[in-house]
Amino acid sequence: MTEHTERLPFQQGEIAVLRQSIDISEELLSEHYKISTSQWKRYRYDIQSLKDLQTKEITDLAFAQIYRYAQSPHERLRGSETGDYFKICLQDHVVRRAVKRDATIQLFPLSLYIVTHELIHVIRFAKFLQRFDSTAAEQEVEEGRVHALTFKLLENCKIPGLPEVLSAFKDCRTMETFFPA
């Protein structure tokens, strides 16, 4: 299989599933972390799928990568405004490969797990509970911590296929990589 065919972006139906998982994840995290709709604005992030990624933001080794930028390309900041912008780079082809490889894994619960996991990282970075620039050992500890938080948040959700995803990834240690821009 060529690199081009392996890296096919999500189609319209898959994007709709992804949007649904983002909505549910944000709702769950809002309740858990007591984040109001207006407070979400201070968590400067975007979730992009493969078709909207730069070449450097694409990998075959993780479901997602988080890039930290000084600002969103869609924002104009005044000199007094600062803060990191986190770009969650979903790797459509890696997610799709996992769904095809395991018949018990479905796109919606898997994308819900991935998005929830990544947004927990963003919240932790924004609240300074974890440094973005950390050693490999610190990142590994943080991954374990975020996997545990994600599992705990999702374990009682009544979503078809989610128990299979939680079971499949219970021992997973790496979901993504972090890169300063």
Label each residue range with its predicted role:
Residues T2-I15, R19, E155-A181:
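Long, well-structured alpha-helical subdomains associated
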Residues Q106-I120:
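Short alpha-helix carrying the canonical HExxH Zn2+-binding catalytic motif
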